[in-house]
Amino acid sequence: MARLGQLHNYHLLFKSQAVCPYLSHLNQASKILDCGVGTGAFSLALLESVAQSAHVSGVDISYPMLTQAQQTLKNRCTSLDLRCGDIRRLPFADESFDAVIFAHVLEHMAEPVETLREMSRVLKPGAPLIGSVTRKSLGQVLMSLHWHNRGYTSNQLASFLQATGLEAVNSFDYGTGWSRWMCLAAVGVKSR
């Protein structure tokens, strides 16, 4: 995604009025989980935009992506814990994280609501789940020929988060340029 200029758009997302208030509690002692961490760009944008430093855990199914994430994040975190695994079965205890984030991974899941439920399981009460997905569009259809991903509407994304029991759900577009037409973001908070 960094090659596509997404890092700048990720910064805009975390600094936006729709997301920033949910992250004001983060500090160096906070624990953040990035599901489908990939290259680490989404976590890096969060750290650079809001948290400065935190304990970051990341799960990805790809060892090469974890290697890239290690390079991206190694000097940016209070601590870094990267694990190869399936985000549908997270290797963490219930209510472990102060924030859970994900970028462009939900589109690859056959059961998006079940995947989000698993992410919500590891959130502490009152903590946010923040994610980015590909918007359902002609561009997404063309992308799916290469990446085999789904696209979602804003209403679909919001309904997925609501189905997990998250509160204060908001779904919106973000970024500049092509990202504004291709990406959606959502935020929800685990009930206390």
Task: Give, region by region, the residue ranges found by the protein language model.
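Conserved class I S-adenosyl-L-methionine
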Residues: 1-27, 41, 45
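Class I SAM-dependent methyltransferase SAM/SAH-binding core
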Residues: 33, 39-89
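A conserved beta-strand element that flanks and buttresses the S-adenosyl-L-methionine
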Residues: 101
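Short catalytic micro-motifs in class I SAM-dependent methyltransferases
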Residues: 104-105
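A short glycine-rich, Lys/Arg-flanked "PGG" loop and its adjoining helix->strand segment in the class I
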Residues: 113-125
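Conserved beta-strand signature within the Rossmann-like core of class I S-adenosyl-L-methionine
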Residues: 127-133
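Acceptor-substrate binding/catalytic loop of class I
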Residues: 141-156
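Core SAM-dependent methyltransferase catalytic element
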Residues: 175-192
